[in-house]
Amino acid sequence: ANRPVYIPPPRPPHPRL
């Protein structure tokens, strides 16, 4: 049985100032 792996939502790329 495989354990459900929590996948965090993709974060938007932060603008590099």
Swiss-Prot record:
Cellular compartments annotated: Secreted
- InterPro entries associated with the record: Apidaecin (IPR004828)
UniProt key word Secreted? yes
Name the major location.
secreted
The UniProt keyword set, sorted, is: Antibiotic, Antimicrobial, Immunity, Innate immunity, Secreted
This entry carries the following GO cellular component terms, namely:
extracellular space
GO annotation (BP), single: innate immune response
Instruction: Copy out the induction comment.
Output: By bacterial infection.
Q: Which family does it belong to?
A: Belongs to the apidaecin family.
- What's this protein's function? Antimicrobial peptide active against many Gram-negative enterobacterial and plant-associated bacterial species. Not active against other bacterial species like H.pylori, P.mirabilis, B.pertussis or N.gonorrhoeae.
Q: What is this protein called?
A: Apidaecin +A
What is the scientific name of the source organism? Answer: Bombus terrestris
